[in-house]
Amino acid sequence: MDLYELLEPTLAGLGYELVDLERSPGGKLLRIFIDKPGGVNVDDCVTVSNHLSRFLAVENVDYDRLEVSSPGLDRPLKKTADFIRFAGESVKLRLRVALQGQRNFVGILREVKDGILKLEVDGKMLDLELTNLEKVRLVPKL
């Protein structure tokens, strides 16, 4: 079973969303990014870390170091639910295949529907296929 698929329901049961996970080359460092309504704090990270340490041992997942943190202000958007939740926000994204010779865009996420993300860039609306999105992140409001 995929590690993401293993962790997602476990974290949901604790009241957290699995935003992302990273594994270092060799798999010895495991980074888990979590969120919940209202955001996460250090106590949340400690709670999840303690729970996952035991859970991963039972599931026989090989790693040396576990890091649990919030996704940060520039959190990645990966799921359709993320795009719906953050509609109206500024995002920067990278496409797998260039559109009109360009792969990187910054704009306002307007909506996602039927596998198409609508991104407003300089007053123009772009229709981007979700399958062509390589990376999407929020642009922090400072």
Curated annotation (Swiss-Prot):
GO terms for cellular component: cytosol. Keywords: Cytoplasm, Ribosome biogenesis. InterPro entries: Ribosome_maturation_RimP, RimP_C, RimP_C_sf, RimP_N, RimP_N_sf. Disulfide bonds: none annotated. One of its GO terms (biological process) is ribosomal small subunit assembly. The keyword Transmembrane helix does not apply. It is found in: Cytoplasm. Coiled coil: none annotated. Its main location: cytoplasm. Belongs to the RimP family. Required for maturation of 30S ribosomal subunits. This is Ribosome maturation factor RimP. The gene is rimP.
